[in-house]
Design a protein with these regions (language model features):
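Class I S-adenosyl-L-methionine
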Residues: 112-152
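S-adenosyl-L-methionine
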Residues: 28-75
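Conserved class I S-adenosyl-L-methionine
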Residues: 1-7
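Conserved SAM-binding loop of SAM-dependent methyltransferases across substrates and taxa
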Residues: 8-21
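Short glycine-dipeptide loop
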Residues: 21-22, 100-105
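A short glycine-rich, Lys/Arg-flanked "PGG" loop and its adjoining helix->strand segment in the class I
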Residues: 86-102
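Glycine/threonine-rich flexible loop motifs
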Residues: 74-85
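Short strand-turn motif at the edge of the Rossmann-like AdoMet-binding core
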Residues: 30, 70-71, 109-112, 135-136
């Protein structure tokens, strides 16, 4: 299990509690998180060139589940913020292409906002069984939703 943008660590705690006991769990974020037993946390930027190698060094096999709840710091400009989240999701997709095993799952935050058309086409090339989920806790007017899909 790999969590990109893992701070503050909530999804890692859920993965540890509900994931298979044999799962290796790794979280990566720019920010340091509190230690969680049996979870590897790496303080790193996902845009660093060596990120895929670092991920591969932490797993003996490809990853079965890649999670990402990343969101950029808000600039106050909805268009800029939307482009930033698209950039994050594109990077998550690039990483998933190399580290996610066939039939592995990707769960990623995505924001609706108009500029995601090209991104959706890229997603359809790499992934299948694409579903969208809006948590009940998310405000109705919020563009936040989640993408759940399987790697081809």
């Amino acid at each position: 299990i790999l969590d990109l943008g893992c701070a503050p660590g909530g999804w890692l705690q859920v993965a540890k509690k509900f994931g298979p006991k044999s799962s290796r769990i790794v979280g990566i974020d720019l920010l340091k998180i509190e230690k969680i037993d049996d979870v590897v946390s790496i303080e790193k930027d996902i845009f660093d060139e060596d990120i895929k190698e670092i991920i591969q060094k932490n797993f003996t096999n490809k990853v079965g589940l890649l999670m990402s709840d990343m969101s950029p710091n808000s600039s106050g400009n909805k268009k800029i913020d939307h482009l930033r989240i698209i950039s994050l999701i594109e990077r998550v997709l690039e990483i998933a292409k190399d580290v996610l095993k066939p039939n592995g799952f990707l769960v990623s935050k995505i924001f609706q906002g108009g500029a995601q058309g090209d991104l959706i086409e890229k997603i359809k090339i790499e992934l299948r069984d694409i579903k969208y989920f809006k948590p009940k806790a998310s405000r109705k007017q919020s563009p936040e939703t989640y993408l759940i899909a399987k790697k081809n």
